[in-house]
């Protein structure tokens, strides 16, 4: 009898958590700039690209983060693993210092995802990003999904799976 009650309470707590995080993601949802695919970006290696120039047959994970962000310390390793597995990842280092500072941080943490430095937060402002980390999943040039705050490798992997096969 106790196990049944424990399972019922656990399920109730889990569903409440899912509802609350979904509401928070909806409220924190960024606004996609109209010219999303035309925006030219430059990564820390000096490569210039646009979101449109990325493979449109694969979902793109756009990851807004900061070196100062506590939750990002837990999310960035998951993002790095996904990038190593071949997923398209473009990260935006938000207000994290100059390029040398960001490169140093990436190197110290052994992160190898494509990174654009946004030292003044101008790019993030165009998206109305108010929370880090914010992860925007782009599919065929459109925003497919958004998640904010702490998220896991498996949570992202499931989202990417759905974007690849149903997006």
UniProtKB/Swiss-Prot annotation:
Signal sequence coordinates: none
Membrane-topology annotation of the record: Single-pass membrane protein
Alphabetically ordered keywords of this record: Cell membrane, Disulfide bond, Membrane, Redox-active center, Transmembrane, Transmembrane helix
Domain Thioredoxin, first and last residues per copy: 30-167
Subcellular location: Cell membrane
Superkingdom of the organism of origin: Bacteria
Keyword Disulfide bond carried by entry: yes
Main subcellular location of this protein, as a coarse class: membrane
Transmembrane segments: 10-27
One Pfam family hit: AhpC-TSA
GO cellular component, one term: plasma membrane
GO molecular function per UniProt: antioxidant activity; disulfide oxidoreductase activity
S-S bonds: 69-72
Record family assignment: Belongs to the thioredoxin family.
Protein name: Thioredoxin-like protein HI_1115
Taxon lineage: Bacteria, Pseudomonadati, Pseudomonadota, Gammaproteobacteria, Pasteurellales
């Amino acid at each position: 009898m106790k196990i049944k009650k424990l399972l019922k309470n656990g399920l109730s707590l889990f569903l409440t958590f899912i509802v609350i995080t979904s509401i928070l993601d909806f409220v924190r949802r960024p606004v996609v700039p109209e010219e999303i695919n035309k925006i030219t970006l430059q990564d820390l290696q000096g490569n210039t690209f646009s979101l449109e120039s990325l493979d449109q047959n694969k979902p793109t994970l756009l990851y807004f983060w900061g070196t100062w962000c506590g939750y990002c310390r837990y999310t960035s390793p998951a993002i790095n693993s996904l990038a190593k597995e071949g997923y398209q990842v473009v990260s935006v280092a938000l207000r994290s210092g100059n390029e040398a500072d960001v490169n140093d941080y990436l190197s110290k943490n052994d992160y190898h995802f494509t990174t654009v430095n946004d030292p003044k937060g101008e790019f993030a402002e165009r998206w109305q990003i108010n929370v880090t980390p914010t992860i925007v999943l782009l599919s065929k040039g459109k925003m497919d999904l958004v998640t904010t705050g702490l998220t896991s490798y498996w949570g992202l992997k499931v989202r990417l799976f759905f974007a690849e096969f149903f997006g």
